[in-house]
């Protein structure tokens, strides 16, 4: 777009600051480090226990790191340099980790042989399985301990002969504490979850409960599963929908320059099509924030501040990160939209400076 502004006037730029340009001014405080509350919203509906996200880079975040990030209270954002099918598997891998009620339960039939069930459990990596009929009614439970004697003398015997038919079950509203008490009282390691008709709906295991107790500060969704984010391109609506259906909590519109009207239009369309929160980025100015805060669940800030990012070198475009965060936060805070500072964080102090400038997470 043509401008009547003289070229020389364009050089009269306002001051803009980055991390090395500022320090926090010390002030009086009674807050001890271990008493600090670091919980923060990273999007409209997702709260973290620490304000830290991992980068959506193919050398950084896949399901393993995303799982550990959520266990520590943060958020892992899966990169998009993979097929949609691989992405779905990665999301599901995070969601399965540490879940209290296992939904994808490995089950046995009473008419299978002991050898068949032993092979199945070895293949699926489980040490026991509920025994159900064709209607998923729980008839019993079978474990490696039940099977072991039969493998020596009667591996063709049926599961109904080897299973434990006195099954301790629980309903959907069971708490981790209640499930643990059931296991302790009855000396068992797994409790099938059933509906009012005794149909199997899930399974709680001792290992799952202990894993959850180990990570008591983990960031979880309303079902108790670990939270996970997924990066998608601005024109990848199909990938965004697949991520949403797989259970992703946040879809990140991943673009080097999100202050592009086509990007904003497609981001708005994606937001209308998915149930997950949608975070839009990256932007670096007040004007960009004004274009997206009316629909975005979060805004990601950073035009080339990263140590290996070449955006500023290649395009000659960018904004010093402290000023960029502050400008975007001025707008986003008026709409209760969280701000994420993306890039340029070299030291822990830089993260603190970004938060002081208005970021909710880094």
Regions found by a protein language model. Give the residues of each.
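Catalytic cores of alpha/beta
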Residues: 64-66, 238-246, 283-301, 341, ...
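The conserved cystathionine-beta-synthase
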Residues: 56-58, 108-125, 132-133, 151, ...
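Short beta-strand/loop segments at the ligand-binding rim of alpha/beta enzyme cores
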Residues: 47-52, 100-105, 221-231, 269-284, ...
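Glycine-enriched alpha-helix->loop->beta-strand junction motifs that scaffold or abut catalytic
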Residues: 70-75, 245-251, 273-276, 294-298, ...
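Short beta->alpha transition motifs characteristic of CBS
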Residues: 78-83, 126, 130, 138-153, ...
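Catalytic beta/alpha-barrel core
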Residues: 77-81, 107-108, 128-130, 169-171, ...
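N-terminal capping/small domains of soluble enzymes
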Residues: 1-117, 122-124
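Active-site-adjacent beta->alpha loops and helix N-cap segments on the catalytic face
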Residues: 34, 83-92, 152, 199-219, ...
């Amino acid at each position: 777009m043509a401008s009547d502004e003289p070229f020389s006037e364009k050089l009269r730029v306002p001051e803009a600051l980055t991390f090395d340009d500022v320090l926090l001014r010390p002030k009086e405080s009674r807050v001890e480090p271990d008493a600090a509350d670091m919980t923060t919203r990273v999007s409209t509906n997702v709260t973290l226990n620490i304000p830290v996200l991992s980068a959506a880079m193919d050398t950084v975040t896949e399901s393993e790191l995303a799982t550990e990030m959520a266990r520590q209270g943060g958020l892992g954002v899966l990169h998009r340099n993979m097929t949609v099918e691989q992405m779905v598997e990665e999301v599901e891998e995070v969601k399965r980790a540490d879940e209290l009620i296992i939904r994808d339960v490995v089950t046995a039939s009473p008419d299978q042989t002991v050898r068949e069930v032993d092979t199945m459990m070895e293949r699926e990596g489980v040490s026991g399985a509920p025994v159900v009929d064709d209607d998923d009614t729980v008839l019993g439970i079978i474990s490696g301990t039940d099977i072991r004697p039969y493998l020596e003398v009667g591996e063709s015997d049926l599961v109904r002969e080897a299973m434990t038919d006195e099954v301790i079950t629980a309903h959907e509203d069971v708490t981790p504490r209640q499930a643990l008490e059931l296991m302790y009282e009855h000396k068992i390691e797994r409790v099938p979850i059933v509906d009012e008709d005794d149909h199997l709906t899930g399974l709680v295991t001792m290992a799952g409960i202990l894993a959850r107790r180990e990570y008591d500060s983990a960031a979880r969704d309303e079902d108790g599963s670990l939270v996970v984010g997924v990066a998608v391109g601005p024109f990848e609506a199909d990938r965004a929908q697949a991520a949403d259906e797989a259970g992703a909590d946040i879809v990140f519109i991943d673009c080097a320059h999100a202050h592009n009207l086509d990007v904003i239009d497609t981001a708005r369309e994606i937001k209308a099509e998915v149930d997950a929160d949608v975070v839009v980025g990256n932007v670096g100015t007040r004007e960009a924030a004004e274009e997206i805060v009316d629909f975005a669940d979060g805004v990601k800030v950073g035009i080339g501040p990263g140590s290996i990012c070449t955006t500023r070198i290649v395009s000659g475009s960018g904004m010093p990160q402290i000023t960029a965060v502050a400008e975007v936060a001025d707008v986003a805070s008026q709409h209760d939209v969280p701000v994420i500072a993306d890039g340029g964080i070299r030291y822990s102090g830089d993260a603190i400076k970004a938060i002081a400038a208005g970021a909710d997470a880094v």
